[in-house]
Structures are given as structure tokens and as C-alpha cells.
Design a protein with these regions (language model features):
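Substrate/ligand-engaging "lid" and interaction regions
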Residues: 1-480
């Protein structure tokens, strides 16, 4: 029996015109940008900002057909931290094309003067930027295909380049390319990727883009789990629906957008977005508090035997540890962005981590630590070392990370596989070493010489020995 009431949009979708073309119609996009835009369309003055979805991958077929059958509509279940859900039927997706069958329609849509913003959720890897060089990889097979076959593209870069070529030829005017992916400086990354592609293919178009296309940075935040078949069944049962493509997410949402649009924009600030001149302060807050805290709780929680984040955060010891890290270690280095209550932000983070309905896997937070430490942990640790701060909590994190990588066994004797793909052969030699200080020379930590920082090495060595002899949780109890 249905237990949730569905909040349905009240506007006439026939009165809505697509002004946004979106690449990557996945769950996060449908819980974030489409959620905000569907609410925005309740305002009659904003009805020229509907969304046209562009799905270009062969693997998109199932979702494309499900959404097409439902005329672009679907239900979003917003899971409250208080255990109560809000359900919405969203209608912002007014057009939808699948590139495998409708390539020309997508290309023509990019050239349509009604389309004034192209938005992207193509994932971090989708920008095709080399981790080693930071440059766009022109030798990628699909990219090479698109460079040689401009009217038969496979990638978002190829689609956008050919669509903009048509836009330039028809005089349809400027356009904004807005990344909504969860990565730092996402607009700068999008600019590097798309401009590198176009410069390699069409110098005239590249010059036109320099004058007519902007790439605003934005910061996005909303936990949106993958929807498994059992989730679809559960959501439809709870909501009394027969939705082939439902989505569920947490009740927190944040979207900070650099106000740098080439051809106008929706009034997203009226539905909760924060428009700003610079997203850097917001990114720093998120990286230093949300992402760093995720990393902090991941390895100790996993070593203690927790496999779900919400279960770990309902352990008072871990919750206290995370909050001490936020308050004592990190807050001095995080200037609050304009109109932001930092205390409320931290409290909300702890509540979000403990939300049982959208629980994350601890293993996912542990995955690829080599990529996370340089971005989330090292910048503030370097400042803390320089300021001669107490470093016991961060030292404990490093000791727990070493134990996780070296011993593959938790406090309960349960063995596990480690997934840290960017560690090098030399890194693994340092992990295997019986000298704990060798671990501090790992490539993810190379931005500073941790072994020379005695205010760090002393507590670190203590933590290494304690975790090995007493276990991760007993050690944590002693430092709280």
C-alpha cells in the first residue's frame, strides 16, 4: 500500500520550451538540476528554460526508453534525515533524444537559438583529462574518431563541436557550457577539454568559441544512490506508482554557480541555487569538511568492521572523532563563504553522513585513497604542521590508512581486498616496508616531507604501534 503523497508539478508542460540541452541524463542530474528546474518552471516567466536531454551512449538505451515511455516524467523520492520522505513528480525534461538513433536531432538542437545553455553530467573521467599531465588526451580512440568524423560524433566533445559549427554558421548566437559534475573547478576542466578538442579540429570554430562561449564553474552536492531493481520495486510500492525510472536522494541539496552566462540564464536563485562571482570558497569548504571527513572516517570505520557509513556515524565514538576533526583541525583553515553558517554546515554534514535511507558503502569512501589525500587532506595538513598544531587525529588517519593498505585485515580478523589503483610499484614497496616512516614517502603525500615534520611523525608512530597491537577502535577510544 502506498505510504507517500506525490507532489506533482502544476504547470502545463505544453507551455514549456527547452532552453537547456543536457548531456548525461543520469540519476544525479535528475535529482539535482532537473529537481531545481522543475520547481523553477512553476514561475510563468521561466517557461523558456525546460530541459532537452541528450543521451549519447549505447548503454543509455534502457533509461532512454523508460523515460521516453513516460514522456520524460519520473518520480523523485527525497529521503529526510528525520525518516520522512517527500515525493515529487518532475516535468522539466520536455524533450529527449538518444544519439544512437537521433544524432542529427541533437546536433540541430545545439544550433537552435532557443537553446542557450548546454549542461553536463558526464562524470570526472568523461572529460578525458590525463591524470599524469593534466592535458586533454587527443589520442583517445573515440576522440580520434570524432576529430576525423565531425558529422558522425560519438563523444560529447564531437557533438558539441559539430553543433556549435552549425550554430556559428546560422548566426544563432552565444551559448554557455555549464558543468554540473562533482569535481573541483569543473568549468575550467570543461573549458580545457572542449577547447582542446575544437582547437585540434577547427581553428575558426575555436576562435568563435573564445568570443561566444562561457564555461562557469559550479559546485554541486546531493547524495543520490544508484537505483537497483529492488529499489525500483520498493519505491513504486511506497509511492503507489509504476515508474520505470524512479530516483531517490537525500534531503540536502546545494548548487553554487559562477554567474558567468553568455546568453542569459534561468532564475535558479529563486529555487535554492547560490549565484556567486567565485565558487572557490565554497569548493574549499566542501573539500576540507565534507570530503576530508569522509576520508577521515573511512579507514578507521572499515578497520573496526563497519561497512555502511550511516552505521559508523551512529557509533558515538566515530561521530565524536569526526566532529573534533572538523571543529579543532579544519575550521581554522576554512573561511566561511558569504551567507554561510559554518556551524550549521558541519552539523548538517554529520546528520547527512548518518542518514540511513541513502547510506553509502564505507568501501566506496576507502577506494582510491591515493587520489583523495592530495586534494582533501594534504593542503590543510601542511598548514597545520607549519602552525605547530596538535596532529593526533590526522596522524591516526595516516596510521589507519597504512594498516588498511598493509595488512588487509580488520579488527575482527576479517580479510578484505584493497582497491587503490593509482598507487605505484614504488608505493607498494613503501607500504610493504616494516619501517612505518617509509610509508610517509608515498606518492600521494609528496607535496610535503612528512618524515621531516617531527610534530607529525611522533604521534603517527604512536598510532601505528597502537593500531597494530590494540586495534583501530581501541586506539581511537584512547585519543578521544
Amino acid at each position: 500500500m502506498a505510504t507517500n503523497v506525490i507532489n506533482k508539478y502544476s504547470y502545463d508542460r505544453n507551455s514549456v520550451k527547452a532552453g537547456i540541452l543536457h548531456f548525461g541524463v543520469g540519476n544525479f542530474h535528475r535529482a539535482h538540476l532537473e529537481y531545481m528546474t522543475s520547481h523553477l518552471l512553476e514561475d510563468p516567466t521561466q517557461r523558456s528554460w525546460g530541459i532537452c536531454g541528450a543521451m549519447i551512449l549505447p548503454g543509455d538505451e534502457r533509461l532512454y526508453k523508460a523515460l521516453k515511455e513516460q514522456n520524460g516524467e519520473y518520480t523523485l523520492t527525497v529521503c529526510g534525515r528525520d525518516g520522512k520522505n517527500e515525493v515529487y513528480r518532475l516535468g522539466a525534461l520536455v524533450e529527449l533524444y538518444w544519439g544512437i538513433e537521433q544524432k542529427e536531432a541533437i546536433l540541430d538542437k545545439i544550433a537552435d537559438p532557443d537553446i542557450r545553455i548546454i549542461t553536463l553530467t558526464i562524470t570526472e573521467g568523461g572529460y578525458n583529462i590525463s591524470r599524469q599531465t593534466g592535458e586533454f588526451m587527443l589520442d583517445n580512440a573515440q576522440v580520434a574518431h570524432d576529430l576525423a568524423n565531425p558529422v558522425n560524433p560519438l563523444t560529447a566533445f564531437g557533438y558539441v563541436a559539430e553543433g556549435l559549427r552549425r550554430r556559428k554558421a546560422s548566426g544563432a548566437g552565444p551559448i554557455t557550457i555549464l558543468s554540473c559534475d562533482n569535481l573541483q573547478h569543473n568549468g575550467n576542466t570543461a573549458r580545457r577539454a572542449f577547447m582542446s578538442f575544437v582547437e585540434a579540429q577547427d581553428q575558426e570554430l575555436a576562435a568563435w568559441m573564445e568570443e561566444n562561449v562561457t564555461f562557469p564553474n559550479s559546485m554541486v552536492d546531493r547524495i543520490t544512490p544508484a537505483t537497483r531493481p529492488e529499489d525500483v520495486e520498493r519505491l513504486n510500492k511506497e509511492n503507489g506508482t509504476d515508474d520505470k525510472a524512479p530516483v531517490y536522494c537525500e534531503d540536502f541539496i546545494q548548487w553554487v554557480v559562477e554567474d558567468n552566462f553568455a546568453a542569459g540564464r534561468p532564475a535558479w536563485e529563486t529555487v535554492g541555487a547560490q549565484m556567486t562571482d567565485d565558487v572557490t570558497a565554497f569548493e574549499n569548504m566542501k573539500l576540507s569538511l565534507l570530503n576530508a571527513s569522509h576520508t577521515l572516517l573511512s579507514y578507521p570505520s572499515f578497520l573496526y568492521g563497519y561497512r555502511k557509513v550511516d552505521a559508523a556515524m551512529h557509533d558515538e565514538r566515530i561521530a565524536k572523532f569526526v566532529r573534533q576533526f572538523m571543529d579543532i583541525d579544519i575550521t581554522p583553515y576554512v573561511p566561511a563563504p558569504k551567507d554561510t553558517d559554518l556551524e550549521l554546515y558541519k552539523q548538517t554534514l554529520c546528520e547527512r553522513f548518518g542518514n540511513r535511507t541513502v547510506s553509502d558503502q564505507v568501501a566506496r569512501l576507502c577506494f582510491d585513497g591515493a587520489s583523495k589525500f592530495p586534494v582533501y587532506v594534504m593542503p590543510n595538513l601542511e598548514k597545520m604542521i607549519g602552525d605547530d598544531k596538535e596532529l593526533i587525529r590526522v596522524a591516526y588517519l595516516f596510521a589507519a590508512y597504512r594498516h588498511y593498505l598493509k595488512y588487509h585485515t580488520d579488527d575482527n580478523g576479517e580479510q578484505f581486498e584493497v582497491a587503490d589503483p593509482w598507487l605505484t610499484v614504488d608505493d607498494h614497496k613503501l607500504i610493504d616496508s616494516d619501517e612505518p616512516l617509509d610509508f610517509l614517502a608515498l606518492s600521494p603525500f609528496r607535496s610535503t616531507d612528512l618524515r621531516a615534520a617531527h610534530n607529525f611523525t611522533q604521534p603517527y608512530l604512536r598510532m601505528v604501534e597502537s593500531i597494530k597491537s590494540k586495534g583501530a577502535m581501541k586506539t581511537l577510544e584512547e585519543i578521544l
